[in-house]
């Protein structure tokens, strides 16, 4: 079993695996209007992936973390850096990376995708398709309180 992690606002704990956030906002790996759940290969990377979008005004938000167990029988599709467009790390994200994952979401080939992190390319983000049939096989942990260390808020 492979483990992935997700961090979400505590007020969305019951909705953290619906993919509803993707309906309202685009992300590096999807177009707005698509259900997707973002996870990461480590808890530290999950924290960084959230924290890069925050500033001091967000210091009072309550967060939760989820452990995600991906059983061996659940296929994981992977995109290697060599398969990505030259602009894949640009900020803001370009449409080229959004289209790659959007095609994967539409295809329904796998519930789990592994892509390099734009923050730390040697590590992986784990987009999850909550509408794919294997999604129900994932072991979604209970929400646990998560707190960003106060030294991070500069």
Which residue ranges define each predicted feature?
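Glycine-rich, charged/polar anion/phosphate-binding loops
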Residues: 22-23, 52-53, 98
């Amino acid at each position: 079993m492979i483990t992935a992690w997700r961090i979400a606002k505590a007020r969305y704990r019951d909705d953290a695996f619906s993919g509803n956030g993707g309906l309202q906002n685009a992300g590096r790996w999807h177009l707005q209007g698509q259900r997707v759940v973002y996870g990461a290969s480590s808890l530290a990377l999950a924290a960084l992936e959230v924290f890069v979008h925050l500033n001091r005004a967000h210091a009072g938000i309550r967060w939760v973390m989820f452990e995600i167990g991906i059983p061996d029988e659940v296929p994981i599709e992977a995109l290697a850096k060599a398969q990505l467009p030259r602009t894949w790390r640009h900020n803001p994200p370009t449409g080229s990376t959004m289209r790659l994952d959007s095609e994967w979401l539409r295809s329904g080939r796998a519930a789990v995708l592994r892509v390099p992190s734009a923050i730390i390319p040697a590590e992986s983000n784990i987009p999850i398709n909550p509408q794919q049939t294997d999604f129900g096989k994932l072991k979604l942990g209970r929400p646990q309180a998560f707190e960003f260390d106060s030294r991070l808020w500069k």
